[in-house]
């Protein structure tokens, strides 16, 4: 019995785009879906009520590495799991921690059966293995767990990318075997997604995807994106990879993207995406609107009485002027981050809802052509 189920409700005959529903133990998720990032079990500046009730977020992403170091997976287990710990009623996807560990560079060492790393908090030594990261994420009670993978930097040689990809495949097999054994004793439902790697080499991506499909997991992720590569290359890699992944399973593009990129990935068969940009850029005064990007510190907004985005129905846009938002930002007020983050996440969610509606109504190609021009400033 699958740990989650996925059904496709509409497909675009002219692209690879599809609309679906992902069924999890913590509710149904309409796809394509954008997942806000709650690294430390919180989306900075927003409460869980803001996210679930006001914005309608159905799934969040949290970070295995950061929560493992603080407060620790055993404490989270003792507190009843991550859902109860952070008072979140809907689904949670946790990454494996691999991206963060491999970003540590001099603070980690790769072995065939895992990676040893030093905590960026206090220098303590830790080890992640394919099996241990599964156990950590099960302690969290995550609905969707990610397999430990190696995310190489960009660019790397074809030789190293192949070695890294083969290691990722071995880790995926080990993690999946352990996960299936753990599921025999678990009363709750969880799903495991392996991650396709291979840097920007399409032959390696295809080889990796083919090997991972043999595991017959509940879904598949495409990692190693947004690591400095040109956007056309990223889209090319996704297109080559997606062609091998089963149409009956959800596909997740990790760490993407800007507003103008979202429909491009959906057009290539992607169902799930996440990115820190809407919240991080919000805190830095970069706001996404239906008319393009607004850099709120610019002087032209000093006496602008209009809403941030006239087409947006979020609380920020219904209640405050651009002039007031600029005042908050220039004054360093915490309220700015709250209002800006709320708006940016709303904008991303609105884009995904527009995409889904376009797929179901049969107008996605027209939507894609329109959005490529209207959102180019935001991308």
Swiss-Prot record:
One of its GO terms (cellular component) is cytosol. It is an enzyme of class 2 (transferase). It catalyses: 7-aminomethyl-7-carbaguanine + guanosine(34) in tRNA = 7-aminomethyl-7-carbaguanosine(34) in tRNA + guanine. Pathway: tRNA modification; tRNA-queuosine biosynthesis. Keywords: Glycosyltransferase, Metal-binding, Queuosine biosynthesis, Transferase, tRNA processing, Zinc. The keyword Repeat does not apply. Residues 255-261 are annotated as: RNA binding. It comes from the Bacteria. The keyword Membrane does not apply. Zn(2+) binds at residues 312, 314, 317, 343. Substrate binds at residues 95-99, 149, 197, 224. Its cofactor is Zn(2+). GO terms for molecular function: metal ion binding; tRNA-guanosine(34) queuine transglycosylase activity. The active site is at residues 95, 274. Its EC number is 2.4.2.29. This is Queuine tRNA-ribosyltransferase. GO terms for biological process: queuosine biosynthetic process; tRNA wobble guanine modification; tRNA-guanine transglycosylation. InterPro entries: ArchSynthase1/Queuine_TRR, TGT, TGT-like_sf, tRNA_ribo_trans-like. Catalyzes the base-exchange of a guanine (G) residue with the queuine precursor 7-aminomethyl-7-deazaguanine (PreQ1) at position 34 (anticodon wobble position) in tRNAs with GU(N) anticodons (tRNA-Asp, -Asn, -His and -Tyr). Catalysis occurs through a double-displacement mechanism. The nucleophile active site attacks the C1' of nucleotide 34 to detach the guanine base from the RNA, forming a covalent enzyme-RNA intermediate. The proton acceptor active site deprotonates the incoming PreQ1, allowing a nucleophilic attack on the C1' of the ribose to form the product. Homodimer. Within each dimer, one monomer is responsible for RNA recognition and catalysis, while the other monomer binds to the replacement base PreQ1. Belongs to the queuine tRNA-ribosyltransferase family. Pfam families: TGT (PF01702). Binds 1 zinc ion per subunit. NCBIfam families: Q_tRNA_tgt, tgt_general. The lineage of its organism: Bacteria, Pseudomonadati, Acidobacteriota, Terriglobia, Bryobacterales. The gene is tgt. PANTHER family: QUEUINE TRNA-RIBOSYLTRANSFERASE (PTHR46499:SF1).
């Amino acid at each position: 019995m699958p740990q989650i189920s996925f059904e496709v409700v509409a497909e675009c005959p002219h692209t690879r785009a599809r609309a679906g529903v992902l069924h999890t133990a913590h509710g149904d998720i309409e796809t394509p879906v954008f997942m806000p990032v709650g690294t430390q079990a919180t989306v900075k500046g927003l409460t869980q009520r803001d996210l679930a009730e006001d914005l309608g977020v159905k799934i969040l992403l949290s970070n295995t590495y950061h929560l493992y170091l603080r407060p620790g997976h055993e404490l989270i287990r003792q507190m009843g799991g991550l859902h109860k710990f952070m008072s979140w009623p809907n689904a949670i996807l946790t990454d494996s921690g691999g991206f963060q560990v491999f970003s540590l560079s001099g603070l980690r060492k790769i072995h065939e059966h895992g990676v040893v790393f030093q905590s960026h908090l206090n220098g303590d030594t830790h080890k992640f293995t394919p099996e241990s990261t599964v156990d950590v994420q099960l302690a969290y009670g995550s609905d969707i767990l990610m397999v430990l993978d190696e995310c190489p930097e960009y660019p790397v040689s074809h030789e190293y990318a192949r070695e890294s990809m083969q290691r990722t495949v071995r880790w995926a097999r080990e993690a999946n075997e352990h996960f299936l054994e753990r599921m025999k004793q678990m009363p709750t439902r969880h799903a495991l997604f392996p991650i396709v790697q291979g840097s920007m080499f399409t032959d390696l991506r295809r080889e990796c995807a083919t090997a991972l499909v043999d595991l017959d997991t509940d879904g598949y992720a495409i990692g190693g994106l947004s690591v400095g590569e040109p956007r056309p290359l990223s889209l090319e890699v996704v297109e080559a990879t997606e062609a091998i992944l089963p149409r009956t399973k959800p596909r997740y593009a990790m760490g993407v993207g800007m507003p103008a990129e979202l429909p491009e990935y959906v057009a290539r068969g992607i169902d799930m995406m996440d990115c820190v940009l809407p919240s991080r850029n919000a805190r830095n005064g970069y706001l996404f609107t239906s008319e393009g990007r607004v850099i709120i510190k610019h002087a032209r907004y000093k006496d602008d009485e209009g809403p941030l985005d006239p087409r947006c129905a979020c609380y920020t846009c219904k209640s405050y002027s651009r002039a007031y938002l600029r005042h908050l930002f220039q004054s360093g007020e915490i309220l700015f981050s709250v209002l800006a983050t709320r708006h940016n996440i709303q904008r991303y969610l609105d884009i995904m809802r527009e995409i889904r509606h376009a797929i179901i109504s049969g107008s996605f190609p027209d939507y894609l052509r329109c959005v490529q021009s209207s959102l180019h400033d935001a991308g």
